[in-house]
Amino acid sequence: MKFDILTLFPAMFDGPLTESILKRAAEKGLIEVKLHNIRDFAFDRHSVTDDYPYGGGAGMVMKVEPLAACIEHAKVGSPRARVILTTPRGRSFNHAVAEELAREEALIIICGRYEGVDERVRELFVDDEISIGDFVLTGGEMAAMVLVDAVSRFVPGVLGSDESAVNDSFADGLLEYPQYTRPAEFRGLGVPSVLLSGNHQEIAKWRRRQSLGRTAASRPDLLTDAHLSASDREYLEELQRVAGSDG
């Protein structure tokens, strides 16, 4: 999986992309991340990449010429790449979108800045617009890091266990169950006995119910589209009855 990241600030990516899982994935050749400095494609000696908006208004707009040249340069090495613009107006990024993008051969990610990019960049080059949340960042670099990290988890071999991505929060539409490791007791708090029982059926049942409970408490909106069995629905109804009696 190849990621071409178009940015005005390539140094921002030094830490997040050169440590931990992403570092090992790159060393194994499972992913490739290539940074392209948009300033290198400016047409004037001052490397200007932004200008005042036509019609007036606050802030600056990223110019079309440097971005067009940078995108076309990236496409030489990744001709079938999907071009993504990080922007608050894009579709919401989530687990399913990350899995979808992981099926692409390559992604070209444009990191927006200032008041945004010249609309002609969208019209001529952009295949998809992605937002990581209903808030505004200084630039698209942080969003690009999120995309690379989340998408890479679906690339075969990137995670230590093939089950890791499957069992992550949101993989089945629910939040993940609580996790414990040694020691078995810490400051009076012990590990739930079921996890020490060796009974895998009961462990699976406990984990499922914990996921349901956590999701109902913190992200009830996820339950609408979650894959729920009859047993799941009965348990959720039981939780509602208990909550109602406590209230």
Curated annotation (Swiss-Prot):
Compartments in which it is found: Cytoplasm
Keyword field: Cytoplasm, Methyltransferase, S-adenosyl-L-methionine, Transferase, tRNA processing
Reactions that this protein is recorded to catalyse: guanosine(37) in tRNA + S-adenosyl-L-methionine = N(1)-methylguanosine(37) in tRNA + S-adenosyl-L-homocysteine + H(+)
A GO cellular component entry from the record: cytosol
Primary location class: cytoplasm
The EC number(s) this enzyme carries: 2.1.1.228
InterPro entries in alphabetical order: Alpha/beta_knot_MTases (IPR029028), tRNA_m1G_MeTrfase_C_sf (IPR023148), tRNA_m1G_MeTrfase_TrmD (IPR002649), tRNA_m1G_MTases_N (IPR029026), tRNA_MeTrfase_TRMD/TRM10 (IPR016009)
One term of GO molecular function: tRNA (guanine(37)-N1)-methyltransferase activity
Residues given in the record as S-adenosyl-L-methionine binding sites: G112, I132, G133, D134, F135, V136, L137
NCBIfam families, per the entry: PRK00026.1 (NF000648), trmD (TIGR00088)
Subunit structure: Homodimer.
Name of the protein in its database record: tRNA (guanine-N(1)-)-methyltransferase
Gene from which this protein is expressed: trmD
